[in-house]
Amino acid sequence: MVLLDSLVGTIVGINGPVIKAEGMSKFKMREMVMVGKKKLIGEIIILENDLATIQVYEETSGLKIGENISSTGMPLSLKLGPGIIGNMFDGIQRPLKKINEISYGFIDEGIGLISIDEEKEWDVNIVVKVGDKLKPGDVYAEVQETNIIKHRIMVPQDVNGEVTKVKESGKYNIEEKIVTVKDGGNIYELNLYQRWPVRTPRPIKNRLSLGKPLITGQRILDMFFPIAKGGTVAIPGGFGTGKTMTQHQLAKWSDADIIVYIGCGERGNEMTEVLEDFPKLIDPKTNTSLMNRTVLIANTSNMPVAAREASIYTGITIAEYYRDMGYDVAIMADSTSRWAEALREISGRLEEMPAEEGYPAYLPSRIAEFYERAGYVENLNDTEGSVTVIGAVSPAGADFSEPVTQNTKRFVGAFLGLDRKLAYARHYPAINWLTSYSQYNVMLTDWYLENISEDIIELRNKMLKILFEENKLQEIVKLVGEDVLPDDQRLILEVARILKVGFLQQNAYHDEDTYVPKEKQYKMLKAIELFYDNAYKCVKMGIPISKIRNEEIFGDLIKMKYNIPNEDISGIKVIEEKISSYYEELIEQYRK
């Protein structure tokens, strides 16, 4: 990165991460600058005549008034190339492993804008030849980045022309020029990376309708509140309701090709847990370590607040880059509330007029900007890819009426509200089936009918209806007890208990239960439905509920999630046969 010596400003005010400087008339809005003697990384966020306001992405302790501001001549941007997958970055794409080697556990000020490894040599397969016409987005080389991710090197947005020179396939680092393209009088030498400004969405050819689900292996999501590839999801919940655990489960088991996990303003221990767990976990699709498809962006609560604001954009830009190669990417942002708090803090230091609860008036548009970068798209190189955004929201006191939750709700397609009462009752995932919803149910209907069963929609609605009825009946039970209810309503309570404990509750630490294939999920629901239909028939014949309630069958239905292996679900058939024969015999006895 070259500093432009001709452009120099002077610091005239310091307020935490916000710097005021003069002599800035030739600088540009959103330009990345180097601040002070330590060359701290900053970004111009307000430019008025000669005065500029700069937000600094590093600790500003020790800066003095009168120190210089240098120009880099480019916006805050990322280096996009091989070496991103399996790596862990801070909020502005500086690799934490490398920083650890330099400064031993602490991020020193002025460490510079280091990024992906420039010296590592990659096995590069060049897929173009002299005379080929190239346009933006075309693939001109391929690198096997991990054993499951093939990194496609694409033509940058400003390059268009004919290939005039090509190196042979072989070992190259990301800085070496491997292809030369001529466009009229312009000659472009292409290497293995490109730069992209974080706040600008990457271009696409077309947005496509959402029609494929993101299979997560979590029963409540896949069966009741499905997520579409390219969709947007909010997971709001108070302290201790399991937001991070739910995000970890989605990052581990969802069938996206690549996961970008952003720890935005959360505890450092949680990122440590990800770093310790993911390399040990095996991806069920590829039988290799989960780190081979994961990018981690760690911007913990004690890191500079301005970098927290940038980390969300860093994550989504990396996700879009891999989407452009034709991959399905899922991005986990934990938590967007901390990001909104960073906006609030910077807004306060800028002395902007606060809106509701002190958040800036532009909070809704910033949240929309982020979620609108999701989607299932046709790329410039005619491949299809998707970015699915799953954002955790941490409302203070589990108050869902606060601004971040309410504004997020406006822009997402699925809302998975976590419930304190469920969490305190140790029902995890604590997703409340009464307040949660997914608008993707309708969009994904065709896929579910084709790939699971023709009765799946009917079955899902029937089970949800039982859960809603049980909620109404609980009000009566609390007042007068269960015994006064008629038997058909008591049956609803029993079936809902099986559904809640045996189906909706899922153990993230159990080998069989942490991830459940969709076929087993469907068969489990069918077994519960078979029990309900047979038991309902008995109730209508006047058979007392005490006879209908068979503890052995109840136990089998509740424990089938643990006892029946995911690879061989024939055990569910045995349970169904037991249900059918027991209730047929019961009906025969009462007919006599």
Curated annotation (Swiss-Prot):
It comes from Clostridium tetani (strain Massachusetts / E88). It catalyses: ATP + H2O + 4 H(+)(in) = ADP + phosphate + 5 H(+)(out). This is V-type ATP synthase alpha chain 2. It is an enzyme of class 7 (translocase). It comes from the Bacteria. GO terms for molecular function: ATP binding; proton-transporting ATP synthase activity, rotational mechanism; proton-transporting ATPase activity, rotational mechanism. GO terms for biological process: proton motive force-driven plasma membrane ATP synthesis. Its EC number is 7.1.2.2. ATP binds at G237, G238, F239, G240, T241, G242, K243, T244. Belongs to the ATPase alpha/beta chains family. Keywords: ATP synthesis, ATP-binding, Hydrogen ion transport, Ion transport, Nucleotide-binding, Translocase, Transport. PANTHER family: H(+)-TRANSPORTING TWO-SECTOR ATPASE (PTHR43607:SF1), V-TYPE PROTON ATPASE CATALYTIC SUBUNIT A (PTHR43607). GO terms for cellular component: proton-transporting ATP synthase complex. Produces ATP from ADP in the presence of a proton gradient across the membrane. The V-type alpha chain is a catalytic subunit. The keyword Ion transport applies. SUPFAM superfamilies: C-terminal domain of alpha and beta subunits of F1 ATP synthase, N-terminal domain of alpha and beta subunits of F1 ATP synthase, P-loop containing nucleoside triphosphate hydrolases.
